C-alpha cells in the first residue's frame, strides 16, 4: 500500500539571497511541487557542512553558483541530508514510491536541465551542478529532487531501514574520506624481474600518517584502520583532540592489531618521530587533513619509497601554491594526489559500511538542533566552536542546541518521539 503524506503549502528553509551572513535567513517559502520527472522529499535530518561558509561568503561568485542573481532566485542551502519521498511525479511512479528513504549525492555531474536562463551564458559549458547551490538543499522541511539528480545517478537508497536519519546524513562527508583514500595508488613488485601491479587504497601492513585530528581527520582514522596498516600516526597541535583519538579508536585499533600513536608536532619533530617508528623507511601513506601549507611541505621529509601524499585539506585561494622537494618525488617515486568530494558510488559504499557496522557515525556527531539553530550552528562551525558534526532535524522543534558526546540510533529514536 502506497504511503500517503500531507504536504503543506509553505515550509521553513535556510535561504541565501546575497553575499555574507547578513543575507542568510530562515524564512517561510512555498513548498515546491514536483513536475512529471521530479519528486518531492521530506528532509528527515541534515548536516551542517563547512562548505556552506564558503558559499555564504562568496554568494553568486562561488564557482558552483555560476553567476545566479541570488536576489531574484535565492538559494536553499544544505548539501548533507537524509530524505523520505512524499510525492512522486507521474513519469516516475513505476520506479519510486512515497515512503522510500534515500540520500542525495550533492555533487551532480550533469548539465543544467531546469532554468538554464539563470546560469551564466545560458548554462553553456556547465557540466556540473550541485545540491545546496543551484539545486535546492537539505536545510529545509522539504527538498525537490529534480531531473539532474536522477540523470546523474545521485539518488541512493538506504541499504537498511534501521539506519538512523542522522547517520545517513553523515554519508556525504564520510564518502569524501572514502573517495580520498581510494585515490591512494601503490605499485607492488615481488622481485626485480616481476611485472609491477597496482592496487588502490592505503598500504596494508604499512605506516599511515594522518595530519589533523579534527572531525574529517577522525573520519580518516576510522577508515584507515579498515586497511589494516601496521601503524597509524595521528598528528595535531591540540592535545584534547589527540586524547579524543585514543579514546575513540584505541580499542578498535587494538582489536585489529593496528598500532595507533598520537603526536604533537608543536612539542617535537614529526619527521624524526615517523622515521624512527618506521625503521627509517618513512611513511607509506600521508593524509593532510588540515589546510596548512607547512603540513604539506613538511610531509616530503617523512614519506618513504613509493609513498603517497594526499592533499585532503584545501588551502585558501591566493595561498594555494606550495613548494615541493622535487628530488624527493623523483628519487623516492612519491605520488601526490587529492580529491574533492565523492561520487555516487562512494556514498553507496559508505552506506554499506554503516549498515555492516564497519564505521560508526555516532561518535562523530556532537551537536543536535533544528532549523531555527542552523545559522547559529554555522557560525559556531566558522568560529571552530564545534569539534564534530552538527545535525539538524527540520521537523523537530527544540528550544536549544543539544551538545552530545555521541548520537546513536536509540538517541535519535528517543529524541524524535518528543518535542521541546
Short names for language-model regions:
Residues 2-9, 188, 247, 272, ...:
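C-terminal hydrophobic helical "lid"/dimerization subdomain
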Residues 30-47, 61-115, 159:
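Glycine-rich beta-strand-centered segment in the early N-terminal region that forms part
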Residues 67, 109-202, 207:
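NAD(P)H dinucleotide-binding glycine-rich loop of Rossmann-like/cofactor-binding domains
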Residues 176, 216, 224:
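Hydrophobic/small residue at the entry helix of a nucleotide-binding pocket
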Residues 204-206, 210-213, 221, 225-295, ...:
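Adenosine-nucleotide cofactor-binding segment
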Residues 237-238, 315, 342:
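Residues in the short beta-alpha loop(s) of Rossmann-like NAD(P)-binding domains
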Residues 307-308:
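Glycine-centered, small-residue-biased loops immediately flanking beta-strands
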Residues 313-332:
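Rossmann-fold NAD(P)-binding glycine/threonine-rich loop
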Amino acid at each position: 500500500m502506497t504511503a500517503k503524506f500531507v504536504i503543506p503549502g509553505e515550509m521553513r528553509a535556510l535561504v541565501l539571497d546575497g553575499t555574507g551572513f547578513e543575507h542568510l535567513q530562515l524564512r517561510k517559502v512555498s513548498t515546491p511541487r514536483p513536475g512529471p520527472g521530479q519528486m518531492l522529499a521530506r528532509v528527515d535530518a541534515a548536516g551542517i557542512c563547512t562548505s556552506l561558509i564558503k558559499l555564504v561568503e562568496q554568494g553568486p561568485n562561488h564557482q558552483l553558483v555560476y553567476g545566479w542573481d541570488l536576489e531574484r532566485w535565492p538559494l536553499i542551502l544544505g548539501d548533507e541530508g537524509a530524505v523520505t519521498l512524499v510525492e512522486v511525479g507521474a513519469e516516475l511512479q513505476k520506479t519510486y514510491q512515497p515512503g522510500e528513504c534515500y540520500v542525495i549525492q550533492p555533487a551532480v555531474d550533469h548539465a543544467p536541465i531546469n532554468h538554464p536562463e539563470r546560469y551564466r551564458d545560458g548554462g553553456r559549458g556547465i557540466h556540473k551542478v550541485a545540491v545546496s547551490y543551484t539545486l535546492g538543499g537539505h536545510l529545509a522541511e522539504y527538498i525537490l529532487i529534480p531531473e539532474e539528480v536522477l540523470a546523474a545517478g545521485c539518488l541512493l537508497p538506504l541499504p537498511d531501514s534501521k539506519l538512523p536519519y542522522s547517520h545517513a546524513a553523515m554519508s556525504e562527508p564520510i564518502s569524501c574520506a572514502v573517495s580520498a583514500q581510494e585515490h591512494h595508488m601503490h605499485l607492488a613488485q615481488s622481485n626485480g624481474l616481476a611485472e609491477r601491479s597496482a592496487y588502490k587504497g592505503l598500504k596494508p601492513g604499512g605506516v599511515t600518517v594522518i595530519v589533523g585530528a579534527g572531525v574529517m581527520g577522525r573520519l580518516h582514522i576510522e577508515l584507515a584502520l579498515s586497511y589494516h596498516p601496521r601503524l597509524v600516526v595521528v598528528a595535531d597541535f591540540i592535545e584534547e583532540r589527540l586524547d579524543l583519538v585514543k579514546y575513540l579508536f584505541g580499542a578498535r585499533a587494538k582489536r585489529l592489531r593496528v598500532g595507533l600513536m598520537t603526536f604533537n608536532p608543536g612539542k617535537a619533530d614529526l619527521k624524526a618521530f615517523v622515521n624512527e617508528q618506521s625503521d627509517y623507511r618513512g611513511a607509506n601513506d600521508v593524509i593532510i587533513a588540515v589546510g596548512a601549507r607547512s603540513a604539506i611541505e613538511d610531509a616530503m621529509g617523512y614519506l618513504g619509497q613509493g609513498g603517497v601524499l594526499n592533499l585532503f585539506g584545501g588551502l585558501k585561494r591566493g595561498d594555494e601554491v606550495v613548494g615541493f622537494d622535487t628530488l624527493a618525488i623523483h628519487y623516492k617515486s612519491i605520488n601526490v594526489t587529492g580529491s574533492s568530494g565523492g561520487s555516487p558510488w562512494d556514498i553507496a559504499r559508505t552506506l554499506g559500511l554503516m549498515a555492516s557496522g564497519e564505521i560508526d557515525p555516532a561518535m562523530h556527531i556532537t551537536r543536535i538542533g533544528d532549523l531555527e539553530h542552523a545559522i547559529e550552528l554555522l557560525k559556531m562551525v566558522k568560529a571552530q566552536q564545534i569539534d564534530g558534526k552538527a545535525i539538524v532535524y527540520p521537523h523537530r522543534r527544540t528550544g536549544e542546541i543539544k551538545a552530545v558526546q555521541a548520537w546513536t540510533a536509540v538517541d535519535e529514536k528517543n529524541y524524535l518521539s518528543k518535542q521541546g
